[in-house]
């Protein structure tokens, strides 16, 4: 009897996982707001254009993440990502938004011939890497899902964000807003969109085995008027 149960367990564990794809598009909708004056403070938390960029130069898709915010068994998770980094270069953070699954480590190399001091006061992860010069790096592990806004004590115009997601099923939209998450185990999920300044949107979806689930997000972003 024990051997029979063991055999059944092995068959079940080795069975292929039925999976489908999530495909969709993010449409940006604009609304006029009064032009804001942003003072030299960390209060905006990413609401202002990053690193002094003009609004028309901002890559809004690069500031957007789409991910499954639901529990997925370890047997169904994706392979770990290579080490991600946010470099300090030309008094800017590159990249502006990095996405990692919970438990991942991110490095912060200083490639400027000046000191930087990277820090965050976010609820998901609070840290202060201290002052360090060109050629050195610091690493931090991010265990709790959620957005982590990153700044520099010495250069208030520098800001970036790390979006820590609960699993490996995430993506960022392409240049026209299209996105795809493939190989998702069949089931019901909460699909969330996060934007660096606009926050969260979400949809409840059902992924069928070997099928495609279509999703559309309308992302409201403000356009300042003179």
Task: Give the predicted meaning of each segment.
Residues 18-226:
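Extracytoplasmic copper-binding redox domains, predominantly the cupredoxin/blue-copper superfamily
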Residues 9-18:
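Hydrophobic h-region of N-terminal signal peptides that target proteins for export
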Residues 1-7:
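Positively charged n-region of N-terminal signal peptides that target proteins for export
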């Amino acid at each position: 009897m024990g051997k029979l149960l063991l055999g059944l367990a092995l068959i079940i564990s080795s069975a292929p996982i039925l999976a489908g794809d999530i495909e969709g598009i993010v449409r940006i909708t604009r609304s006029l707001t009064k032009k804001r004056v942003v003072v030299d403070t960390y209060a905006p938390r990413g609401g202002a254009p990053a690193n002094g960029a003009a609004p028309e130069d901002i890559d809004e898709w690069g500031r957007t993440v789409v991910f499954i915010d639901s529990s997925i068994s370890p047997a169904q998770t994706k392979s770990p990502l290579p080490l991600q980094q946010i470099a300090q270069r030309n008094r800017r953070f590159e990249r502006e938004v990095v996405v990692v699954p919970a438990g991942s480590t991110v490095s912060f190399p200083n490639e400027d011939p000046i000191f930087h001091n990277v820090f965050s006061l976010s609820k998901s992860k609070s840290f202060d890497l201290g002052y360090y010069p060109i050629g050195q790096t610091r690493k931090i592990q991010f265990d709790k899902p959620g957005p982590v806004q990153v700044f520099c004590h010495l250069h208030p115009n520098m800001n970036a964000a790390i979006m820590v997601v609960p699993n490996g099923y995430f993506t960022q939209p392409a240049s026209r807003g299209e996105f795809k998450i493939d190989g998702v185990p069949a089931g019901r999920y909460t699909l969330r969109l996060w934007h660096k300044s606009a926050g969260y949107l979400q949809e409840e979806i059902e992924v069928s085995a070997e099928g495609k689930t279509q999703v559309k997000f309308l992302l409201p972003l403000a356009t300042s008027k003179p």
